[in-house]
Amino acid sequence: MSDSLWHLYLLRTTSGMLYTGITTDVARRLTQHQAGKGAKALRGKGELALVFHCEAGDRSTALKLEYRVKQLSKQQKEKLVMNQPSSLVSLLDVRTD
C-alpha cells in the first residue's frame, strides 16, 4: 500500500460546504461517501459532487497536502475548484511559521 498513488479530492454538499479528503481510489471513495459509509461529516448532507481532485503522491505527502488544504479559507478552496490545478505540491513549500 505504501507504493500506491494517493489523490486529494474536494466534495461539495448541496448546502455548498466543501469537504477535503485523500484516497487511493477517488471513484470508490465517492461511492462510499454517497452510500453514507464515508466520513461522518458528510452523512445526511444530501447529494455530493466531486468538484476537484489531483494526484498527491505517496500517503505521507497526501496527508500533508490534505492538512494544508483544510487550513485554506473557503475562498481559497473555491479558487482551487475554479482553477483546477493539476498539482498542489506548491502548498507544501509555503511556511506558516
From Swiss-Prot:
Domain spans labelled GIY-YIG: 4-79
> What InterPro entries is this protein classified in?
GIY-YIG_endonuc, GIY-YIG_endonuc_sf, UPF0213_domain, UPF0213_GIY-YIG_endonuc
Under the heading Gene3D superfamilies, the entry gives: GIY-YIG endonuclease (3.40.1440.10)
- What is stated as this protein's family in its record? Belongs to the UPF0213 family.
Listed name of the protein: UPF0213 protein YE0453
